[in-house]
């Protein structure tokens, strides 16, 4: 009972702290100048993490302290960015969008809290607006909704083509961006605590390997998002797979399976409404059986290729929005994970040090004490102070010496 009373009291204190909350020095909008991000007139370096579960846990006021704990641990290490989902759709527990245009207010307030807490501590957010995958009601849920309304849809990739589904997505964009945060009283589209939106988490369109379908959708939706919210940066949420616009890269860098997903790193980001490039590095997912030396060699080629293309072809910053090494990888060791982090961070730092296009990296994923239901093979608890956490902290120290804006 004493524990419950303490949790309730903590939730009340946290909620009261947002009344009349003022912007911290790090709370300007992040913008872009060439291949660099800018915050308050200085280069802004992204050293961060993924925590897709923030809104889910914050839906219950009694568990919001877990978000506070994660952000406190992150800021103590100097981390500057968190990436979290802006979707949870369908007939699932704590859904955000329960049906097209219908939203659960309590879950929305969970997302409100995550944004408000990020603002309070000076962390910037990157928020994807839908999932390519079925998890948490991805594009499949939109297709199912359309089918239930009599639309003739045969594939989950009809998400990109069906006009009714496209309107569902646009309505979600409008609802999200026009939402007024119940804690900060600021509309999402006017909230500088958010750095950027992503159109989708890991967009793919396997029914059209030419890439034309996905390209048309990105073009249309990027312009639409910018018409609703011109304040924030926008990216695709891309994994970084190359397409027909760069056949040499496609042949030399792509995992073989990636040649069938209809994505094109160069073409999909070479749009005025897209402000920066996104990529992931899932070497443990794409190449399960690689030995460690081959894995590190791939990471080096993959990152350096994308950094070079962002610098010379796209002339935009690029963020590595997901990377890590899962404990379910064959022959996994903590030392191997540390090597993946060190290799990744070193490549990012070399580019950043020269004023290059590599703007930073976000590892997958952070969890907090008490959220073991979200724990996965790649999860990291920052308070554990593992050797990997020490590497994360050292990267922050090195990036900080470059003299830009590092967050609060």
Swiss-Prot record:
The protein's enzyme class: hydrolase
Organismal lineage: Eukaryota, Viridiplantae, Streptophyta, Embryophyta, Tracheophyta
Major localization class: secreted
Coiled coil residues, start to end: none
Species per Swiss-Prot/TrEMBL record: Arabidopsis thaliana
Entry keywords, A to Z: Glycoprotein, Glycosidase, Hydrolase, Secreted, Signal
Enzyme Commission numbers on file: 3.2.1.78
Signal peptide coordinates: 1-23
Compartment list: Secreted
Record's keyword annotation contains Signal: yes
Record family assignment: Belongs to the glycosyl hydrolase 5 (cellulase A) family.
Positions of substrate binding: 85, 201, 364
Top-level taxon: Eukaryota
GO MF: mannan endo-1,4-beta-mannosidase activity
Protein name per UniProt: Putative mannan endo-1,4-beta-mannosidase P
Glycosylation sites recorded in the entry for this protein: 73
One GO BP: polysaccharide catabolic process
